[in-house]
Regions:
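ABC ATPase "signature
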Residues: 226-227
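Helix-to-loop junction immediately C-terminal to a conserved catalytic motif
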Residues: 53
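Conserved ABC transporter NBD signature motif
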Residues: 61-70
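Conserved ABC ATPase signature
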Residues: 142-146, 150
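Conserved ABC ATPase "signature" region
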Residues: 120-137, 245-246
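ABC ATPase NBD coupling module
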Residues: 70-86, 112, 193, 232-236
Length: 254
């Protein structure tokens, strides 16, 4: 299971509108792993996530899932990855169809991937809501009527409905107040304990202790530092890493 669900990038590069936004990146993620990609705005974090799920064409290097090379592969070759690797966006409102109910949003990926339906009122749907700390009573509501924290949890429930082995989370706490953000991080920690692989993209190092094992620091579209979370947060070496660390003066690693 671990080998068949492993995502591996080697020398990955991405160019957008003639500008190289990511170069020579190596990354490994499998079930149960917890990796953070951190860096300032414009470092290439979101471009990386989009490339990993085929939304940005990688123009250099290798991207393999379950041992299958995907760079240059036809669209059909991406199908196994697009169920097994799910992405939660920074702004859930832009990713959730405003005309669908919560129940329909969560059921939609199951329809797409040919899984048994989770309909309104079903025990499976209610269990999926409970998993992300949402009440069954919201199942008929639409995204525009929910709070930011509720929308982010619905987006997470929707991603989990595809029964993925890996979850990519793009700045999922950036628009939330701190108590709601920490509640969401606690949910991600619990999912990792269930065997889900987690790739967390963030600029906020305060989210990493107790959540992440390995950290990759991006600056200017390339990896400037990487290492175990405890060691890197305690003694960052690169100026980009030190600047991110200085923005969070109180961490358990010092």
């Amino acid at each position: 299971m671990k080998d068949s669900s492993r995502l591996s990038a080697r020398g990955l590069g991405v160019t957008l509108a003639g500008r190289t936004v990511l170069r020579d990146l190596d990354l490994e993620l499998g079930p149960g792993d917890a990796v953070a990609v951190v860096g300032p705005s414009g470092a290439g974090k979101s471009a990386l996530l989009r490339a990993l799920v085929g939304l940005e064409p990688a123009i250099a290097g290798s991207l393999r899932f379950g041992g299958l090379e995907l760079v240059g592969a036809p669209t059909e070759a991406w199908r196994p990855l697009r169920r097994a690797v799910q992405l939660c966006w920074q702004d859930p409102l832009s990713a959730l169809n405003p005309y669908l109910s919560v129940a329909e949003l969560i059921d939609e990926p199951r329809v797409i991937h040919g899984l048994p339906r989770w309909r309104v009122g079903s025990p499976e749907l209610h269990a999926s809501l409970a998993r992300v700390a949402l009440e069954p009573s919201i199942e008929r509501r639409r995204p525009g009527t929910l709070s930011g924290g509720q929308r982010q949890r619905v987006a997470l429930a929707r991603a989990l409905a595809a029964e993925p082995s890996l979850l990519l989370a793009d700045e999922v706490t950036s628009a939330l107040d701190r108590p709601v953000a920490w509640a969401l991080i606690d949910l991600l920690r619990g999912l990792r304990g269930d065997g889900l692989g987690l790739l967390l993209v963030t600029h906020d190092l305060s989210l990493l202790p107790g959540t992440i094992d390995q950290v990759v620091v991006l600056g200017g579209g390339e990896v400037v530092e990487r290492g175990p979370a405890r060691e890197l947060l305690a003694a960052p070496q690169h100026p980009v890493s030190r600047a991110l660390r200085a923005a969070v003066p109180r961490l358990p690693y010092s």
